């Protein structure tokens, strides 16, 4: 088409403006010549030829669109999600219905009071069927290959006939509060297995890198018949020790040549680990991985004996190539037999249950404090006093606490 502005109407790249509709206008050579000629003189309607009025273009019309085509598969039509009762949730979980399990986990993670009430009923009904799995916490530095390793570890277990649930905790943004939840995309093989359940969850700012509701989610997964539970944590470093309070075996994934061997001398996440495994021990990196393993073994000698009496081991493997995977799981099975025979396995679980009870109390008290009307009205005043140096932070905190306790009377 051509561009030509006239006093009557606008032609734009082969389209004519006609009311609110744009109609394609194929211009002939004669039309173009007439238009360019008309641009040099006063516009005359006789010189402006409209091809849409030409009998040769009787088929030219505005396409108003067509109706939606019928669906090939009517079952794909979107329907409203059905709301299950507590009894239906429990029955579905006990027969390993993944849909019921997923929706129940969503209720557990929800902050809505009505969802929390339903979730607590489901958890109480599922408790008698829980506790029969091996809970394994997996953590490590960012980029150590945790998700890829879980994919390889999981395939090894599924081939042995085990049922695996992976709870992947994804870091939430401090700015937006959002989370990518993309860990499942790096578990390509495992995500296709019917005996594997992968549930990414946001950390939601939870200290320790473990989502607050992970403990309850473990109960639901165990009731659904999963005999092995992986808890993959954010991997933020030494502050991530909360995972130790909800798992039976704590696996720390490290890399060679990153300087992390020196961190072994410090207290922290290292002394929590029941085993340290060096990933990416393949190709030209094998010698570096073996050297790093030696450094970690030397560092572990500086720690006091563990409560269980188990001596943490250091192994090397390659998650990408699947090398050394069998040796790692032989070590995990060895630990379980060791802890079960000594009675430490059951003792640790009882201690964890009590610890989480007090953690739940702390969380409930904190929520009650911040949701109090007395605190909401007093907080701005106390904050202003602190910022203008009229009060110290400790005195301001005590003033808020006094107001809260007074409101309870």
Q: Where do the model's predicted regions map?
A:
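Canonical P-loop GTPase G-domain recognition
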Residues: 282-335
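Hydrophobic positions on the alpha1 helix immediately C-terminal to the Walker A/P-loop
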Residues: 149
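Nucleotide-state-sensitive switch-loop elements of NTP-binding domains
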Residues: 88-95, 103-133, 144, 153-239, ...
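P-loop (Walker A) phosphate-binding loop of NTP-binding proteins
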Residues: 141
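Long, well-ordered amphipathic alpha-helical subdomains in the mid-to-C-terminal portions
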Residues: 101-103, 316, 327-405
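Non-catalytic terminal/linker segments enriched in charged/polar, low-complexity residues
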Residues: 33-128, 376, 380-381, 397, ...
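Hydrophobic anchor at the beta1->P-loop junction of P-loop NTPases
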Residues: 136-138
């Amino acid at each position: 088409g051509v561009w030509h502005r006239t006093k009557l109407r606008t032609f734009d790249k082969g389209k004519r403006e006609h009311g609110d509709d744009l109609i394609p206008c194929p211009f002939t050579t004669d039309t173009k010549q007439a238009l360019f000629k008309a641009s040099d003189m006063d516009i005359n309607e006789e010189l402006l030829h409209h091809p849409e009025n030409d009998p040769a273009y009787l088929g030219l019309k505005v396409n108003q669109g067509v109706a939606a085509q019928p669906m090939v598969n009517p079952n794909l039509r979107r329907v409203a999600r059905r709301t299950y009762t507590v009894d239906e949730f429990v029955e579905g979980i006990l027969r390993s219905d993944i849909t019921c399990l997923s929706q129940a986990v969503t209720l557990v993670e929800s902050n809505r009071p009505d969802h929390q009430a339903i979730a607590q009923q489901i958890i109480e009904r599922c408790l008698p069927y829980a506790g029969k799995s091996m809970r394994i916490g997996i953590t490590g530095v960012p980029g150590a290959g945790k998700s890829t390793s879980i994919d390889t570890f999981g395939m090894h277990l599924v081939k042995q006939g085990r049922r695996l649930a992976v709870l992947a905790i994804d870091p939430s943004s401090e700015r937006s509060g959002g989370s990518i939840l993309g860990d499942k995309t790096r578990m390509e093989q495992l995500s296709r297995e019917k005996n594997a359940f992968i549930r990414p969850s946001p950390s939601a700012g939870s200290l320790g890198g473990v989502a607050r509701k992970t403990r309850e989610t473990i109960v639901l997964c165990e009731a659904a018949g999963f005999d092995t539970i992986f808890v993959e944590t954010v991997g933020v470093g030494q502050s991530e020790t909360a995972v130790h309070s909800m798992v039976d075996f704590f696996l720390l994934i490290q890399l060679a040549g990153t300087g992390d061997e020196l961190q072994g001398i410090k207290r922290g996440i290292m002394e929590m680990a029941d085993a340290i495994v060096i990933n990416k021990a393949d190709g030209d990196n094998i010698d570096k991985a073996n050297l790093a393993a030696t450094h970690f073994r030397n560092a572990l000698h500086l720690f006091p004996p563990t409560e269980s009496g188990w001596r943490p081991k250091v192994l090397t493997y390659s998650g990408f190539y699947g090398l050394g995977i069998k040796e790692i799981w032989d070590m995990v099975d060895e630990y379980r037999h060791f802890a079960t025979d000594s009675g430490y396995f059951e003792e640790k679980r009882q201690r964890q249950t009590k610890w989480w009870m007090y953690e739940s109390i702390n969380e409930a008290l904190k929520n009650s404090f911040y949701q109090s009307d007395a605190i909401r009205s007093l907080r701005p005043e106390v904050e202003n006093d602190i910022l203008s140096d009229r009060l110290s932070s400790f005195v301001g905190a005590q003033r808020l606490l006094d107001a809260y306790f007074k409101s309870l009377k």
